[in-house]
Amino acid sequence: LECKEKIPDAAKRTIEHFGIDAGFKFIVHETYPPHSGFGSGTQIAVSTAHLITETMGIEIESRELSTIVGRGGTSGIGTYTHDLGGFILDGGHSKEEKPLFLPSGASKAKPATLIARYEFPEDWNILIAIPEIEVHVEGDDEVDVFQTYCPIPKEEVEQVSHLILMNLVPFMLEKDIKNFGWAVSELQKVGFNKLEHSLDPHYLPTMQALDDAGAYGTGISSFGPTLYTVFDDDNKDIVKAAEEIVGKDKVKVTKAQNHGYVIEK
């Protein structure tokens, strides 16, 4: 359903922006759950625009395409991972660029500026769990959250920045998986993540159960419901535990992708 909505919308925006006099047919072979914290909306929209511009021989950066199709107004993560893959850190927006706190789909701002991009350890296993949650925060509800609870207190923003720059990133570069997981857990206790958990505490028991089962640290992606953790051979039993907690069909083990989009001709 998300593809049926977002592909025509992104195609229409792209065609109108460039004045293209042509029609396009899109065939989607596989996708992943919408509104689940995967950033699928941005990937679908930017990929649609990219296929059109590539076909028409138009050279343009994905950051510009994101703006054209109305994505990336909150975070640049989806745009930069589309191009580069890996671990992305962006710097937010200036008040001139984005005077109001709004989610990506409701903001006309360009994707935030890229601060850093690193290779994510490809030997680390990534566990993704999608618990059954009836309520997804999206659309007008998401806008209401941003307008009601933002800005996040400066002290908490400073805490988040310290955890990322002085803990999460260094531990990742040092391939210290256990302390990287610890940093992920600490990030759940401050800033926007803390707000998310206070507004919807349904995820907390599942996250605690995963941690109790041996996860090095469990995080929530965007507004959820997707939860994630990293693991190695020392705690690989976390996979079986996760399947027992949320259901075997709700768990996926994967690796990092340290490259961007691929166009096959």
Model-found features: residue ranges?
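ATP-dependent small-molecule kinase catalytic core of the GHMP/sugar-kinase superfamily
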Residues: 61-216, 232-265
